[in-house]
Amino acid sequence: MGGFAEAEDLSGVVSDALGKRRRIAGVDRLRGGTKKGVYRIRLDGTGPASLIVYRWADEENFWPGAAGEVTDPFAPVSGLVPFLAARRRLDEVGARVPRVLWTDDTRQRHAADVAVVEDITGGTLEALFDTDPARADAALNDLARTLNLMHRHHAPRYGRVDLLERGGVALGDSCEQLVLDRALRDLDEAAGRDTRIAAARGRLDVRLRALRALVVPRTEYGLIHGELGPDHVLVSAEGHPVLIDVEGLMYFDVEWEHVFLRLRFGERYAALSRPGLDPPRLGLYALAMHLSLVAGPLRLLDGDFPDREFMHAIVEHNLREALALLP
């Protein structure tokens, strides 16, 4: 793992996308990606000063086991096909995503799936909260409208967009059972790695099953990003939110999205909240998500993920939060 692309590797991508008239002036690998490489390419000549290259290469996917079962909404997802399917669906509902300039998944000229997209240079919403709060607040309110469009775009089945687009059927019988089954696996895994979880394992198991028993079935699901934090929202020059890291886009219980939004946006979540969410689902999904954010980062740390201190901090925070949810 961790074999990043060099300027020489990316020059062919730029040449194929833009022609021979543009030359690379510099390359920066952007921080944060765990399933693909994201590179800002600075260019000489006329036209856009920079663009972004997504590179879905095995050596840039830090998750052990790489891609998972496509029918599992929670399995790691990577590649051009789910990216383009997600982008098409977001276009349909009116959510902004970076404009795609060129793609290739043949792996004949390039060793990975690649996409060239426009560079949204206004920074992340997360950064703007510190540097330009007024601009960030306006973008946050616009993001709330975008999420409302997505979450009210319903489907009769849950699952990843690329799977449903092909007529496939997602794993499991219901969102809530899928979440419970995953949470129990995460609990087992985390208990084997951390003594504090191991000590509370029985109580956490009982609590998860009790919360699941309160959930009433439903037959309609909203469109969710799945991992939407302020670091996954860019802000355009016009001040509009632009969603990135969209490969895991799926139809699911919107409560799952809201639990993650509340976790990642903290006190700013109030701008994104909405009435009508199901309290039993929120309770189950909150505990399940905290356990996932203990087990997942611990799994990631088995590899050579570079920002290890950051991952350890995620583990510690979510471990405390999970234990705090015990009665």
Task: List where the protein language model places each region.
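Conserved N-terminal boundary motif of the eukaryotic protein kinase catalytic domain
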Residues: 21-28
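ATP-binding pocket architecture of kinase catalytic cores
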Residues: 31, 35, 42-166, 170
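Active-site Asp-x-Gly
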Residues: 62, 220-224, 229-287
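An alpha-helical support segment within catalytic cores of ATP-dependent transferases
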Residues: 5-21, 108, 132-141, 145-224, ...
